[in-house]
Design a protein with these regions (language model features):
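Peripheral, non-transmembrane regulatory/ligand-interaction domains of membrane transport proteins
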Residues: 1-197, 201-203, 211, 215-218, ...
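Hydrophobic alpha-helical transmembrane segments and their immediately adjacent juxtamembrane loops
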Residues: 41, 217-308
Length: 308
């Protein structure tokens, strides 16, 4: 899907392309990609690089065309292997042509358009737009981190009631998401530091870059804090599970030993050995009483040693 935006004096939608407008491309089909490449002579590998979900944040310049790939947050289904992940957003520019391409429909881009329309100022140039996209991505990383924090708290409350596999698997998935966030944010920070020297920056852009740096730093540090907390939480519950397992094994071993004593004593009386009670009518009662006494002593000993 292609949308044309007039970026001068506010963000308003156009019916067709005009010089210096912004072309927003979301979930492009093969026909959309082919049309853009043929109409604007975009290098053919630009689209394939942007479509690669594992493509790192980077800057590239080819025959007058500039390609910037930014990693932005994206939410899958909550029960998926990684509910929160990141996807590439491509920014393509040459002279009066500015195109953004994302192969996923993200809340960040929807919010970006809505926010710029509320501002009613548009963009001063393509550099201003690029850094505002950086700022929006940092803000949305923080939003998604708050959601992850809420899911972690919910899982911890469930685990406090009962240690179950579903909650532990959920925490593990969120840990994977934080790893993706941390890697992508660092890549965006590295890209931002390079763009400071690649693009022509005026005083307004410098102020905007400072805001982006602040938000990026906060997002990175927040991700690191949540990751450390989640890792510590996982280690704690792993220790609890191991401790519970050890307790169960000690109890089973102790009960097995206690249950083995009557069998051992009655087996001794059942052997063809002379013990002086073969002809006594109360021999069986003595064997039972002896088994109970020895088992009781073993039970008391294990309880005293906190083995059961």
């Amino acid at each position: 899907m292609k949308t044309f935006w007039n970026t001068q004096g506010g963000l308003s939608q156009l019916t067709e392309w005009q010089p210096n407008c912004w072309i927003q491309v979301t979930c492009p089909t093969e026909d959309d990609q082919r049309e853009l490449e043929e109409k604007f002579n975009i290098p053919d590998y630009f689209m394939s690089d942007i479509s690669d979900t594992d493509e790192r944040a980077r800057y590239e310049y080819d025959d007058g065309w500039m390609l910037i790939i930014l990693r932005i947050p994206y939410v899958k289904e909550i029960r998926s292997r990684t509910p929160y992940t990141t996807v590439p957003l491509g920014i393509i520019h040459k002279r009066d042509i500015t195109i953004t391409v994302c192969f996923y429909e993200t809340n960040m881009m929807i919010d970006f358009v809505s926010f710029q329309q509320k501002r009613g100022e548009g963009f001063t140039d393509h550099v201003d737009m690029i850094f505002r996209l950086f700022l929006s991505s940092a803000v949305w990383y923080l939003k998604r981190l708050k959601q992850i924090s809420m899911l972690v708290d919910k899982a911890k409350r469930n685990l406090d009631k009962e240690v179950n596999n579903e909650s532990l698997i959920g925490l593990s998935r969120l840990q994977d998401s934080l790893t993706y966030f941390q890697t992508s944010i660092r890549g965006n920070e590295t890209l931002l530091s390079k763009l400071k020297f690649k693009l022509q920056i005026d005083e307004l852009d410098a102020d905007l870059i400072e805001d982006v740096n602040i938000e990026m730093t906060q997002a990175r540090e927040t991700t690191l804090i949540y990751s450390n907390i989640l890792e510590s939480t996982m280690d704690t519950y792993q220790s609890i599970i191991n401790n519970n397992m050890n307790t169960v094994m000690r109890t089973l071993t102790s009960v097995t030993i206690i249950m083995m004593i009557p069998t051992l004593i009655t087996s001794m009386f059942g052997m063809n050995l002379v013990n002086g009670m073969e002809e006594k009518p109360w021999g069986f009662i003595i064997a039972i009483i002896l088994s109970i006494c020895v088992s009781g002593m073993c039970w008391w000993f294990f309880r005293h040693k906190r083995l059961v």
